[in-house]
């Protein structure tokens, strides 16, 4: 499967997404390029598959009005902070207490990478079982994660305060991050961490649409460094954007993202909670994979799922997967383990069920394609249940 980047026209016009180069670094295989629709305020983004020129993209609509700030031109990103309810044009990308003199402190962090490009991430299912299969500490770990998830959650409704990006643009970005994860065989936890970093950053900072992919790429770069045994090189992440951004820009954005997040990288995710629940629930591999599929679908929609804590979204994914395959919603042992009753989970469960029903008709299909494979028991091919036996 070929990965795709957001490749704008020469002159860095803002809001186009196209597939990455077919030639170049070893990690990506030659193949068809995918040209996506223009990132505008419209909600419709249609895929067009086919061979196209490496520099061809559709025409932009009023792209000259997008770069409204020049104060941070050396970084190549235009951000205003803090985000306020009344959207204003970005004038700088400064933190509230000080100027980010990134030019003075940026280092070439990619030159010393330990990535062995011939090796891929270790099998994550076995790794998670080894890490989490500690019954004597399971409750303590869960209690600690429940405390941390409140601290490291994005702000609900943050997208309404973004003056230049929309929910649809974020959906396209997350869909692309899924493809990047598959191309480089990244762990599922890496994807969940990257989306957490992205949402927390956007909760605090306002970003122009043409730089949204730069933030997303920096987020997955950081998540890979944190989670992977052999993270891809920085040059690989530059490449997957079709060289839309330079290595220097990516490293500067990485540093900016770290500062905004106060270097708090250990954030509980839906994936972590779900792995705990599946170990406690003793369900079959197919049910586990369906729950993973549903939890990844929840990453696409910032609303409504950002309003739910990761532990609750994980519980909803478990319930829906368990009922779809086994006819049972929420077992008593997980109620005792989590403290969540079914009544508490129902609002999130209903939203997730609605998302599952419409998944096949979405323009973004990276998650569906991922879970069609035998590795995941083909769970995205399963028909969703029409209704749930909710009180």
UniProtKB/Swiss-Prot annotation:
GO terms classed as biological process: cell division
Claim: Cell cycle is one of the keywords in the record: yes
Location(s) in or outside the cell: Nucleus
Xref: InterPro entries: Cyclin (IPR039361), Cyclin-like_dom (IPR013763), Cyclin-like_sf (IPR036915), Cyclin_C-dom (IPR004367), Cyclin_N (IPR006671), Cyclins_cyclin-box (IPR048258)
Subunit structure: Interacts with the CDK1 and the CDK2 protein kinases to form a serine/threonine kinase holoenzyme complex. The cyclin subunit imparts substrate specificity to the complex.
Similarity-based family: Belongs to the cyclin family. Cyclin AB subfamily.
Protein name from the UniProt record: Cyclin-A1
Lineage: Eukaryota, Metazoa, Chordata, Craniata, Vertebrata
Gene that specifies this protein: ccna1
């Amino acid at each position: 499967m070929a990965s795709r980047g957001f490749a704008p026209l020469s002159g860095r016009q803002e809001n186009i997404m196209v597939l990455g180069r077919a030639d170049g670094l070893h990690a990506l295989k030659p193949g068809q390029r995918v040209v996506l629709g223009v990132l505008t305020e419209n909600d419709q983004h249609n895929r067009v598959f086919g061979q196209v020129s490496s520099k061809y993209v559709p025409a932009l609509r009023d792209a000259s009005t997008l770069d409204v700030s020049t104060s941070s031109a050396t970084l190549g990103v235009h951000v205003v902070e803090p985000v306020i309810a009344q959207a204003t044009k970005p004038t700088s990308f400064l933190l509230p207490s000080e100027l980010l003199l990134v030019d003075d402190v940026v280092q070439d962090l990619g030159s010393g990478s330990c990535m062995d490009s011939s090796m891929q991430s270790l099998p994550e299912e076995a790794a998670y079982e080894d890490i989490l299969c500690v019954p004597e500490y399971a409750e303590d770990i869960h209690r600690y994660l429940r405390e941390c998830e409140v601290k490291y959650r994005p702000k609900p409704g943050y997208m309404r305060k973004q003056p230049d990006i929309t929910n649809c643009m974020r959906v396209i970005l997350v869909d692309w991050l899924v493809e990047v994860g598959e191309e480089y065989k990244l762990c599922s936890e890496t994807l969940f961490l990257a989306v957490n970093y992205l949402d927390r950053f956007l909760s605090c900072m306002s970003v122009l649409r043409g730089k949204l992919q730069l933030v997303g790429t920096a987020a997955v770069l950081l998540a890979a460094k944190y989670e992977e045994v052999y993270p891809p090189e920085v040059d690989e992440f530059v490449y997957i954007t079709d060289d839309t951004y330079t290595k220097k820009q990516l490293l500067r954005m990485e540093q900016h993202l770290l500062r905004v997040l106060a270097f708090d990288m250990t954030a509980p995710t839906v994936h972590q909670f779900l792995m705990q629940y599946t170990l406690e629930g003793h369900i079959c591999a197919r049910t586990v994979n369906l729950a993973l599929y549903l939890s990844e679908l929840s990453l696409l929609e910032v609303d409504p799922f950002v309003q739910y804590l990761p532990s609750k979204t994980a519980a909803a994914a478990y319930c829906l997967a368990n009922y779809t395959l086994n006819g049972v919603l929420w077992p008593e042992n997980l109620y005792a383990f989590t403290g969540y009753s079914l009544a508490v989970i129902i609002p999130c469960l209903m939203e997730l069920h609605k998302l599952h029903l419409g998944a096949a008709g979405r323009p973004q299909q990276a998650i569906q394609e991922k879970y069609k494979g035998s590795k995941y028991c083909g769970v995205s091919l399963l028909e969703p249940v029409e209704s749930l036996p909710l009180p």
